[in-house]
Amino acid sequence: SINISGTDISKFSDTELDKFRGDNIGIVFQKPHFISSLTINENLKLAKYLSPSKTSGDAKKILESLNIKDKYQQKPNQLSEGEKQRASIALALINSPNLILADEPTSSLDDFNCDNVIKLLKKQAKDHKAQLIVITHDARLKKHFKNNLNL
């Protein structure tokens, strides 16, 4: 069986898995995924709309902590790669997930934004009692985590 947040998801239908993931799992993909015709704000609103049972975070506050609050009304193609990566992190965190999966969350980020992103991910995990799993090749992250698994 596969248990996440005390729920066995191994027998869920595809629809149930989609709903569960939207409510409980925040995913930071290595390459950001957005609906390109929507602004960052609209992408965040859509994520909140698709998971109405969950308490959502404040989009502007999350974007501010990622230093991209001023990009709120821009479309993804108007952002730099680093800004897209940070907006992708906001998208993963907007529904206050119980599990945060971050695949190369600091790719395309400078040192300053790398530190901010890791602090935000760890704070979000602590504040919402969420599990945080980070997959990375980025040596800058090693100092931020006590538990490391090197393969």
Regions found by a protein language model. Give the residues of each.
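ABC-type ATPase nucleotide-binding domains, specifically the catalytic core motifs of the NBD
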Residues: 38, 42-56, 65
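Conserved ABC ATPase "signature" region
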Residues: 8, 56-71
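Conserved ABC ATPase signature
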Residues: 75-79, 83
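A short, proline-enriched helix->beta-strand linker immediately N-terminal to the Walker B motif
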Residues: 94-98
